[in-house]
Amino acid sequence: FNESFATAVERIATPLWLQTHASEATLQRWQQAQTRRALWQHLTRQTRARLHSIYERNAAQPLDEKALAAIKKEVFSDFQAQYAQLRAQWVAADEPLLTSDTLRQQYLERLAQTDDWVARANNASFGALAAYDDWVAAMAHWWTQLQNGQPASPEGWKRFYAQMRELASMQPEQRTQQLCAHQPEQLAPPAACQASTARP
Protein backbone atom coordinates (compact mmCIF):
# COMPACT_ATOMS: atom_id res chain seq x y z
CA PHE A 1 0.00 0.00 0.00
CA ASN A 2 2.67 2.53 1.02
CA GLU A 3 4.76 1.81 -2.07
CA SER A 4 1.78 2.20 -4.40
CA PHE A 5 0.78 5.42 -2.65
CA ALA A 6 4.22 6.96 -3.14
CA THR A 7 4.21 5.91 -6.80
CA ALA A 8 0.70 7.28 -7.33
CA VAL A 9 1.61 10.69 -5.89
CA GLU A 10 4.65 10.83 -8.17
CA ARG A 11 2.65 9.99 -11.29
CA ILE A 12 -0.17 12.39 -10.45
CA ALA A 13 1.95 15.33 -9.33
CA THR A 14 4.78 15.17 -11.87
CA PRO A 15 2.74 15.98 -15.00
CA LEU A 16 0.91 18.75 -13.13
CA TRP A 17 4.25 20.34 -12.27
CA LEU A 18 5.66 19.82 -15.77
CA GLN A 19 2.66 21.46 -17.41
CA THR A 20 3.45 24.75 -15.69
CA HIS A 21 7.24 24.62 -15.23
CA ALA A 22 8.77 22.56 -18.04
CA SER A 23 9.33 22.99 -21.74
CA GLU A 24 7.21 21.16 -24.27
CA ALA A 25 10.17 18.92 -25.12
CA THR A 26 10.63 17.94 -21.47
CA LEU A 27 6.93 17.18 -21.12
CA GLN A 28 7.04 15.02 -24.25
CA ARG A 29 10.03 13.08 -22.92
CA TRP A 30 8.20 12.46 -19.66
CA GLN A 31 5.11 11.25 -21.54
CA GLN A 32 7.32 8.93 -23.58
CA ALA A 33 8.78 7.56 -20.35
CA GLN A 34 5.26 6.87 -19.06
CA THR A 35 4.42 4.98 -22.24
CA ARG A 36 7.52 2.86 -21.78
CA ARG A 37 6.65 2.29 -18.14
CA ALA A 38 3.19 1.10 -19.15
CA LEU A 39 4.69 -1.38 -21.62
CA TRP A 40 7.10 -2.63 -18.98
CA GLN A 41 4.31 -3.00 -16.44
CA HIS A 42 2.16 -4.91 -18.92
CA LEU A 43 5.02 -7.31 -19.60
CA THR A 44 5.88 -7.88 -15.93
CA ARG A 45 2.24 -8.28 -14.89
CA GLN A 46 1.63 -10.72 -17.72
CA THR A 47 4.64 -12.76 -16.65
CA ARG A 48 3.62 -12.66 -13.00
CA ALA A 49 0.13 -13.87 -13.93
CA ARG A 50 1.58 -16.77 -15.91
CA LEU A 51 3.75 -17.78 -12.96
CA HIS A 52 0.79 -17.52 -10.58
CA SER A 53 -1.24 -19.77 -12.86
CA ILE A 54 1.56 -22.34 -12.92
CA TYR A 55 1.79 -22.43 -9.13
CA GLU A 56 -1.99 -22.75 -8.82
CA ARG A 57 -2.07 -25.66 -11.25
CA ASN A 58 0.85 -27.27 -9.49
CA ALA A 59 -0.90 -26.97 -6.14
CA ALA A 60 -4.00 -28.68 -7.54
CA GLN A 61 -2.09 -31.35 -9.45
CA PRO A 62 1.60 -31.45 -8.52
CA LEU A 63 4.15 -31.83 -11.29
CA ASP A 64 7.52 -33.45 -10.91
CA GLU A 65 10.39 -31.03 -10.37
CA LYS A 66 11.79 -31.32 -13.88
CA ALA A 67 8.44 -30.62 -15.54
CA LEU A 68 7.77 -27.63 -13.28
CA ALA A 69 11.26 -26.25 -13.90
CA ALA A 70 10.82 -26.60 -17.67
CA ILE A 71 7.51 -24.73 -17.65
CA LYS A 72 8.94 -21.92 -15.53
CA LYS A 73 12.01 -21.72 -17.75
CA GLU A 74 9.75 -21.20 -20.78
CA VAL A 75 7.93 -18.35 -19.02
CA PHE A 76 11.17 -16.59 -18.10
CA SER A 77 12.57 -17.13 -21.60
CA ASP A 78 9.47 -15.50 -23.08
CA PHE A 79 9.82 -12.62 -20.63
CA GLN A 80 13.46 -12.06 -21.54
CA ALA A 81 12.73 -12.24 -25.28
CA GLN A 82 9.91 -9.69 -25.05
CA TYR A 83 12.08 -7.41 -22.93
CA ALA A 84 14.83 -7.65 -25.55
CA GLN A 85 12.36 -6.41 -28.18
CA LEU A 86 11.32 -3.46 -26.00
CA ARG A 87 14.94 -2.70 -25.18
CA ALA A 88 15.90 -2.57 -28.85
CA GLN A 89 13.04 -0.16 -29.58
CA TRP A 90 14.00 2.10 -26.68
CA VAL A 91 17.69 2.20 -27.59
CA ALA A 92 16.89 3.02 -31.22
CA ALA A 93 14.58 5.85 -30.16
CA ASP A 94 17.08 7.25 -27.63
CA GLU A 95 20.15 7.10 -29.86
CA PRO A 96 19.76 10.70 -31.18
CA LEU A 97 19.74 12.00 -27.59
CA LEU A 98 23.08 10.41 -26.67
CA THR A 99 25.13 13.34 -27.88
CA SER A 100 28.20 12.82 -25.69
CA ASP A 101 30.27 9.96 -24.31
CA THR A 102 29.18 10.87 -20.79
CA LEU A 103 25.49 10.74 -21.64
CA ARG A 104 25.96 7.45 -23.45
CA GLN A 105 27.83 5.91 -20.53
CA GLN A 106 25.19 7.03 -18.02
CA TYR A 107 22.42 5.74 -20.26
CA LEU A 108 24.06 2.34 -20.71
CA GLU A 109 24.72 2.04 -16.97
CA ARG A 110 21.04 2.60 -16.19
CA LEU A 111 20.04 0.16 -18.90
CA ALA A 112 22.47 -2.42 -17.53
CA GLN A 113 20.67 -2.30 -14.17
CA THR A 114 17.42 -3.31 -15.87
CA ASP A 115 19.24 -5.93 -17.92
CA ASP A 116 20.62 -7.44 -14.72
CA TRP A 117 17.17 -7.44 -13.07
CA VAL A 118 15.66 -9.21 -16.08
CA ALA A 119 18.42 -11.81 -16.13
CA ARG A 120 17.99 -12.57 -12.41
CA ALA A 121 14.20 -12.19 -12.14
CA ASN A 122 12.21 -14.80 -10.21
CA ASN A 123 8.72 -15.02 -8.77
CA ALA A 124 9.68 -12.94 -5.74
CA SER A 125 11.06 -10.21 -8.01
CA PHE A 126 7.69 -9.80 -9.71
CA GLY A 127 5.92 -9.74 -6.35
CA ALA A 128 8.16 -6.89 -5.22
CA LEU A 129 7.36 -4.92 -8.38
CA ALA A 130 3.64 -5.40 -7.78
CA ALA A 131 3.92 -3.67 -4.40
CA TYR A 132 4.83 -0.45 -6.22
CA ASP A 133 2.25 -0.71 -9.00
CA ASP A 134 -0.82 -2.74 -8.08
CA TRP A 135 -2.86 0.08 -6.54
CA VAL A 136 -1.55 3.07 -8.49
CA ALA A 137 -4.40 3.08 -11.03
CA ALA A 138 -7.04 2.83 -8.30
CA MET A 139 -5.45 5.65 -6.31
CA ALA A 140 -5.11 7.88 -9.38
CA HIS A 141 -8.75 7.25 -10.25
CA TRP A 142 -9.74 8.06 -6.67
CA TRP A 143 -7.70 11.27 -6.80
CA THR A 144 -9.55 12.36 -9.95
CA GLN A 145 -12.91 11.73 -8.30
CA LEU A 146 -11.91 13.76 -5.25
CA GLN A 147 -11.14 16.81 -7.42
CA ASN A 148 -14.91 17.07 -8.03
CA GLY A 149 -14.43 17.90 -11.69
CA GLN A 150 -12.22 20.89 -10.90
CA PRO A 151 -8.53 21.54 -11.70
CA ALA A 152 -6.06 20.20 -9.17
CA SER A 153 -6.09 22.28 -6.01
CA PRO A 154 -4.69 22.18 -2.46
CA GLU A 155 -8.18 21.32 -1.22
CA GLY A 156 -8.38 18.38 -3.61
CA TRP A 157 -5.01 17.11 -2.44
CA LYS A 158 -6.11 17.43 1.19
CA ARG A 159 -9.18 15.31 0.46
CA PHE A 160 -7.01 12.73 -1.24
CA TYR A 161 -4.48 12.54 1.60
CA ALA A 162 -7.29 12.29 4.14
CA GLN A 163 -8.81 9.40 2.21
CA MET A 164 -5.46 7.63 1.97
CA ARG A 165 -4.89 8.04 5.72
CA GLU A 166 -8.29 6.48 6.32
CA LEU A 167 -7.37 3.60 4.03
CA ALA A 168 -4.07 3.09 5.84
CA SER A 169 -5.95 2.68 9.14
CA MET A 170 -8.17 -0.11 7.79
CA GLN A 171 -7.60 -3.82 8.11
CA PRO A 172 -5.81 -5.17 5.00
CA GLU A 173 -8.84 -7.05 3.66
CA GLN A 174 -11.13 -4.03 4.01
CA ARG A 175 -8.50 -1.78 2.42
CA THR A 176 -8.17 -4.17 -0.51
CA GLN A 177 -11.93 -4.16 -1.04
CA GLN A 178 -11.99 -0.36 -1.11
CA LEU A 179 -9.10 -0.14 -3.57
CA CYS A 180 -10.60 -2.81 -5.82
CA ALA A 181 -13.84 -0.81 -5.91
CA HIS A 182 -11.92 2.18 -7.31
CA GLN A 183 -9.97 0.24 -9.93
CA PRO A 184 -10.75 1.74 -13.38
CA GLU A 185 -13.06 -0.59 -15.29
CA GLN A 186 -10.94 -0.48 -18.46
CA LEU A 187 -7.93 -1.98 -16.66
CA ALA A 188 -7.42 -5.55 -15.55
CA PRO A 189 -7.71 -5.72 -11.75
CA PRO A 190 -4.70 -6.65 -9.62
CA ALA A 191 -4.41 -10.27 -8.51
CA ALA A 192 -5.48 -9.26 -5.00
CA CYS A 193 -8.88 -8.18 -6.35
CA GLN A 194 -9.38 -11.49 -8.10
CA ALA A 195 -8.42 -13.37 -4.95
CA SER A 196 -10.80 -11.24 -2.88
CA THR A 197 -13.65 -11.96 -5.31
CA ALA A 198 -12.95 -15.68 -5.26
CA ARG A 199 -12.82 -15.86 -1.46
CA PRO A 200 -16.08 -17.26 0.04
Where are these regions (language model features)?
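Pan-zinc metallopeptidase signature
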Residues: 45-200
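Active-site metal-coordination segments of metallo-dependent hydrolases
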Residues: 1-9, 124-131
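Post-HExxH zinc-binding segment in Zn-dependent metallohydrolases
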Residues: 2-46
